[in-house]
Amino acid sequence: ASKTFTTTETMRNAASALAWLEEGGVADPYGRLIAVTAAPERAVEFGIDETRVLPFAESVGARYSLWSCIGLPAALALGVDAFEELLEGAAAMDEHFREAPVAANVPVLAAVADLFYAQRGVQTQAIFAYDERLRLLPSYLQQLVMESNGKSVTAEGQPLQRPSSSILWGGTGTDAQHAVFQLLHQGTHLVPVEFVAVAEGDDEQDPAHHRDLLLNCFAQGAALMAGRPAEDPARAYPGNRPSTTILLD
């Protein structure tokens, strides 16, 4: 998959895959490939039959392409039913964004909060997924946010009169707690935090593991808000640190 069908690492992977198939004695290695691209003519020139090329529009940015045929690997790995649920969820959020009043419009409120922090000099935001199934979410959101809003000019090419995207970073659950949370609770930087958790775990052997994860997640948000005094300044938490907790069904 490559939007332009010229991406260096993608083409190198394709060449390696073809070589592997040929070494394995496959008579028609190109017939085992499927191309997903906004430049179908280049895929055909490469040697892939046009019936095995899945095109998508040039206007679809890479960071938004998951919901196009670029999502083929997800559909193959998770099943078409799961992929259709993903599409339905995206459509539901699109409708919410278009129809919900401003005071209850989640994307609008999130954008206003981001702008509020940026205009007050906050340069980073953190997101922590309290479920191993969401371990790649922070990396995905890094591309979604910083590639979308990381330029210093507007869509019309004019210099931006406000801060561009904040720097998004994060990690997974309790691993991050033992690595970076001291800075979030006690440091001099103000870092808005988003916690994402899942109501139901997938550990059928011992549900207590997931319960502990949720307790940790909720406790971190509460501690950021309330803080904790201590005689030893090194152990005190000032509180009044912003965070949002999102609990998925």
Predicted segments with their positions:
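A SIS-like phosphosugar-recognition module
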Residues: 1-249
